[in-house]
Amino acid sequence: MHKPTIEEDLTEEEFIELVLAEQQKALAEDRQQRIQGKKPKKQRPIVKWIIWSMAFVLFFNTFALLFQIYTIPAIEFLKVSTRLSAQEDIQLYKKAVVEVSTGSSKGTGFAISHDGLVVTNDHVVDNAQTLSVVFPEKGIFEAELVESYPEVDLAVLQVQGDDFPALELAQNPSFTKNERVYFIGNPLAFTGIANEGILLETTLLEDWPETVMMMQAPVYKGNSGSPVLDEKGQVIGIIFATMKKEPYGRVGLFVPIQVLHNLRQ
């Protein structure tokens, strides 16, 4: 049995350490290229945009100087998101992925019906005094908790309205090791970040009634409630945590969508 961590709680100090480590790596590679007589790779416009975006975010925390180098592999997940978000299908899926806010914290959720049913994690909305969700294009709405399944960390919210964008839920999906999957969420200080991962295997957590799926993927604080999508764009699971698991290292965890189907029958 293993105890999961509710998301990968990447603190500001840990993030800075990660950036500094990658900065030194990038500078070392640059020096090696110069020694070998090679010209360093020129910065692409999209890389410049990413770097300046990150510098702006951390400027108010006095860390902008850390981003005055030409490449930062530590923000690879932003580069991947930019690449994936250029795809029409990913753009469509992102419209149904929302930011769930309780006033004091935030997470991710996604609409599963055009009349405003939203799935998220129970720990995202637990003890919330107020609830709201923000759709990328339709804006902010008040939400009501209508279903709660704390034993598997799932919750369903209701937003008043209609014609909401929604994701399709897979029916009895199969999981194949090393299969590529996609997920969309609001990690760290960002919103609408698309990323990809690789399916690993199932695991049974301590005090959990159902097995959950592990995936090799960059899951961070704020990704709780993110939908995991297969190649067809159907939701096969809901991210809720990370944990360390040998021999994979830190892995993302998601509740298989069939668990939600069974609970809502």
Task: Name what the model sees in each region.
Residues L84-E88, L169-A170, V181, N186, ...:
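Intrinsically disordered, low-complexity boundary segments flanking structured domains
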Residues S105-K106, S113-G185, A189-G192, P209-E210:
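Conserved active-site neighborhood of the chymotrypsin/trypsin-like protease fold
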Residues M1-E29:
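N-terminal targeting leaders characterized by basic, low-complexity, disordered sequences
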Residues L20-I46:
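N-terminal positive-inside, membrane-proximal cytosolic segments immediately preceding the first
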Residues S101, E144-V146, Q216:
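Conserved beta-strand elements flanking the ATP-binding pocket of the protein kinase catalytic core
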Residues R34-I35, K42-W52, F56-V134, L263-Q265:
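N-terminal activation segment of mature serine protease catalytic domains
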